[in-house]
Curated annotation (Swiss-Prot):
<keyword id="KW-0687">Ribonucleoprotein</keyword>
<dbReference type="GO" id="GO:0003735">
    <property type="term" value="F:structural constituent of ribosome"/>
</dbReference>
<dbReference type="GO" id="GO:0022627">
    <property type="term" value="C:cytosolic small ribosomal subunit"/>
</dbReference>
<dbReference type="GO" id="GO:0070181">
    <property type="term" value="F:small ribosomal subunit rRNA binding"/>
</dbReference>
<dbReference type="InterPro" id="IPR036870">
    <property type="entry name" value="Ribosomal_bS18_sf"/>
</dbReference>
<keyword id="KW-0694">RNA-binding</keyword>
<dbReference type="Pfam" id="PF01084">
    <property type="entry name" value="Ribosomal_S18"/>
</dbReference>
<dbReference type="InterPro" id="IPR001648">
    <property type="entry name" value="Ribosomal_bS18"/>
</dbReference>
<comment type="function">
    <text>Binds as a heterodimer with protein bS6 to the central domain of the 16S rRNA, where it helps stabilize the platform of the 30S subunit.</text>
</comment>
<keyword id="KW-0689">Ribosomal protein</keyword>
<keyword id="KW-0699">rRNA-binding</keyword>
<dbReference type="InterPro" id="IPR018275">
    <property type="entry name" value="Ribosomal_bS18_CS"/>
</dbReference>
<dbReference type="GO" id="GO:0006412">
    <property type="term" value="P:translation"/>
</dbReference>
<protein>
    <recommendedName>
        <fullName>Small ribosomal subunit protein bS18</fullName>
    </recommendedName>
</protein>
<comment type="similarity">
    <text>Belongs to the bacterial ribosomal protein bS18 family.</text>
</comment>
<comment type="subunit">
    <text>Part of the 30S ribosomal subunit. Forms a tight heterodimer with protein bS6.</text>
</comment>
Length: 93
């Protein structure tokens, strides 16, 4: 017969309580600014949504609405193809 260990609450890893208390409310920058379409030539805006290693940051982290996230993905991919934005962190522009 198998024996079961009781789960001890004291041995659980403690979460950082400060990070749970001070969560910033995410909002869509494009909705607030009234942007109709995201342009692939606006490199400064696109770089805000690309991580250090060159990946596109997901909408659940940035707070971008779905319609703008799709436009953002397309714009970043176009800018990469035209060598305006690097594909990875190993390519410096």
């Amino acid at each position: 017969m198998a024996t079961f260990k009781k789960f001890n609450k004291d041995k659980r890893p403690k979460r950082n309580t400060q990070s749970l208390l001070f969560k910033r409310k995410r909002f869509c920058r494009f909705t607030v600014a009234g942007v109709e379409e995201i342009d692939y030539k606006d490199i400064d805006t696109l770089r805000d949504f690309i991580s250090e290693n060159g990946k596109i940051i997901p909408a659940r982290l940035t707070g971008t609405r779905a319609i703008y996230q799709r436009q953002l993905n397309t714009a970043i991919k176009r800018a990469r193809f035209l060598a305006m934005v690097p594909y990875s962190d190993q390519h410096r522009v």
